[in-house]
């Protein structure tokens, strides 16, 4: 296999994704602009959605799963009176209704849609059915019957009513929640039909719009590069560990850090800075830190502290030419 082309660049760029392109389009565009060897994103936004799209480079891609699992916030406009094949503006009209709910009627249905609920995904989604993408089946005239899936919706707030036909909502939710489905379900619960006409993600894990850059704020024109600025990045990046700031920190010594990096386990009782007794369960993650520097994530498994996902390797400690195949336990670098 040939060596990946590009530079070793590490960090997060938080993009304010514009309407139109897919999330993958934006990753590819920015990977090219940064000449990065490795890039990925922290949660898909539909082409007709805008807002916070975290894009990871290098080491930061190791933290993508924690951003995907993180809490997210959205603001969307629900247009009443038309249901559509895609549950957004892009689709064809399926049904119409003259009913327009009042503010009180809308607020009355929101509690039943909040919490741990079952949600039917949009037919036009990337879910696989028998190896095929649901949206491919729908476009081929074979829309699949998608079963309800568990969804966690923390809060739904009616923000404003621009007019009788529309309502604006602010939503906080867990991973994998479809705002198009939620908009559809709000309308149905109100005795009418509807679809999303505007969708914007305002927060994704620790990242919000205050961190985000528009595509116009990123230097994409490589023709302006000179010998003097060839290594300059098109935009500044956030540290790779920024994605982990919501995870509790655990101070470790150099010796303990080396053990974790090498894939060796540690008896929690032997730690210089012990774990709280109430936090030694296997569902707890910790940021292993030496001073202010994050080595990576660790957790307790089978009674011992082990690496879960490391950002650093032996080179952080000034060690070189290490053969990990000869270590007692491999780890993920």
Swiss-Prot record:
Reaction catalysis annotation: uridine(55) in tRNA = pseudouridine(55) in tRNA
Give the superkingdom in one word: Bacteria
What residues make up the catalytic site? Answer: 46
Question: Per UniProt, what is the name of the gene that codes for the protein in this document?
Answer: truB
Protein known as: tRNA pseudouridine synthase B
Kindly list the GO molecular function terms attached to this UniProt entry.
RNA binding; tRNA pseudouridine(55) synthase activity
PANTHER family per record:
PSEUDOURIDYLATE SYNTHASE TRUB1, TRNA-PSEUDOURIDINE SYNTHASE
What family does the Swiss-Prot or TrEMBL record give for this protein? Belongs to the pseudouridine synthase TruB family. Type 1 subfamily.
Query: Does the record's keyword annotation contain Isomerase?
Result: yes
């Amino acid at each position: 296999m040939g060596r990946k082309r590009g530079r070793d660049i590490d960090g997060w760029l938080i993009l304010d994704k514009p309407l139109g392109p897919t999330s993958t389009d934006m990753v590819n565009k920015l990977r090219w602009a940064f000449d990065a060897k490795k890039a990925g994103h922290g949660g898909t936004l539909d082409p007709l959605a805008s807002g916070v799209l975290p894009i990871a480079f290098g080491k930061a891609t190791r933290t993508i799963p924690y951003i995907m699992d993180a809490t997210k916030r959205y603001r969307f406009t629900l247009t009443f009176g038309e249901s559509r094949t895609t549950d957004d503006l892009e689709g064809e009209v399926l049904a119409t209704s003259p009913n327009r709910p009042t503010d009180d009627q809308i607020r009355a249905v929101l509690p039943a849609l909040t919490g741990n609920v079952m949600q039917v995904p949009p037919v036009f989604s990337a879910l696989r059915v028998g190896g095929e993408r649901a949206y491919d089946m729908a476009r081929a005239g074979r829309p699949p019957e998608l079963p309800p899936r568990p969804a966690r919706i923390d809060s739904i707030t009616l923000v404003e009513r621009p007019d009788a036909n529309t309502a604006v909502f602010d939503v906080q939710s867990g991973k994998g929640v479809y705002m198009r489905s939620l908009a559809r379900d709000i309308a149905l619960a109100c005795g009418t039909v509807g679809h999303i006409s505007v969708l914007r993600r305002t927060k994704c894990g620790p990242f919000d719009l205050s961190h985000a850059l528009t595509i116009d704020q990123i230097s994409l024109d490589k023709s302006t590069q000179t010998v003097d600025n060839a290594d300059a990045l098109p935009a500044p990046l956030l540290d790779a560990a920024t994605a982990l700031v919501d995870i509790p920190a655990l101070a470790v010594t150099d010796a303990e850090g080396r053990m974790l990096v090498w894939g060796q386990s540690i008896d929690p009782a032997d730690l210089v800075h012990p774990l709280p007794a109430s936090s030694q369960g296997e569902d707890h993650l910790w940021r292993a830190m030496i001073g202010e520097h994050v080595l990576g994530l660790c957790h307790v498994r089978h009674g011992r502290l082990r690496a879960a996902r490391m950002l650093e390797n032996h080179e952080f400690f000034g060690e070189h030419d290490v053969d990990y195949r000869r270590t007692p336990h491999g780890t993920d670098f």
